Amino acid sequence: MKNIRFDVEYDGTDFCGWQRQPGGIQTLQGELEAQLGRILQENISLTAAGRTDKGVHARLQVVNFMTGSAMELSKMAHALNSLLPDTVRVSNPHVVPLDFHARFSAKEREYRYFLLEEPSALRCRFTGCSKGSLHIGVMQDAAGLLVGEHDFLLLSKEPADKKNPVCLIKECEWQEENGVFVFRIRANRFLRSMVRYLVGVMIAVGRGRAVPEDLGMLLDDGLMTFPLFPAEPNGLFLWDVSY
């Protein structure tokens, strides 16, 4: 048996998230496993670095799987890309150690969120929208409060995250590039929907509906002083994974 790693890039708009689901629901894991199984004539089970939600994209998702196939890896990747939708591509196939695990071997992950102040018909698949003017200075102040180790349980919608809700944020910042507000966050791990909730909080800050100190109280004291809403999924990308 060999342990194979692929890098995967995808537009998540038309998928119901990464994780395989019953009942014929279209997911990225389900699509990739089905087509790999068709090529290799094996039951394939993929492990991924991040389980992205419905509508979330990936510039770099990392997956691995075990196979007994002797097929040349470049041919395997080419065959897989020929069967996948145009919105999903695999690249960089290579054999990795048997103990490599795309999720648990990862040291850091980076997400980016792309945000517009007003809707765009041409960019709506890949940007969220604040539907109003933003003050990037106070949003950056709020982002600075996130650096370090914090309990993010209130910013997750996954009950299983209660077991270990602490994440170490390594880098976190907002930048404006040609009218697009870009949020970049790098951490050792993330809870489910955590980045979308963080962006939602900072949109509230940027529009004057909250202040950075409200985020501080949420993280330090577990106090919610304003309604929490996750940002739209379409602006979010799994951007990088480090091993």
From Swiss-Prot:
Subunit structure: Homodimer.
Positions bound to substrate: Y111
Entry keyword set: Isomerase, tRNA processing
GO biological process terms on file: tRNA pseudouridine synthesis
Transmembrane segments: none
InterPro entries tied to this protein: PsdUridine_synth_cat_dom_sf, PsdUridine_synth_TruA, PsdUridine_synth_TruA_a/b_dom, PsdUridine_synth_TruA_C, TruA/RsuA/RluB/E/F_N
Family: Belongs to the tRNA pseudouridine synthase TruA family.
CDD domains in UniProt: PseudoU_synth_EcTruA
Function: Formation of pseudouridine at positions 38, 39 and 40 in the anticodon stem and loop of transfer RNAs.
Reactions catalysed, as given in the entry: uridine(38/39/40) in tRNA = pseudouridine(38/39/40) in tRNA
Catalytic residues, chain numbering: D53 (nucleophile)
An example molecular function term from Gene Ontology annotations: tRNA pseudouridine(38-40) synthase activity
Assigned EC number: 5.4.99.12
Record's protein name: tRNA pseudouridine synthase A
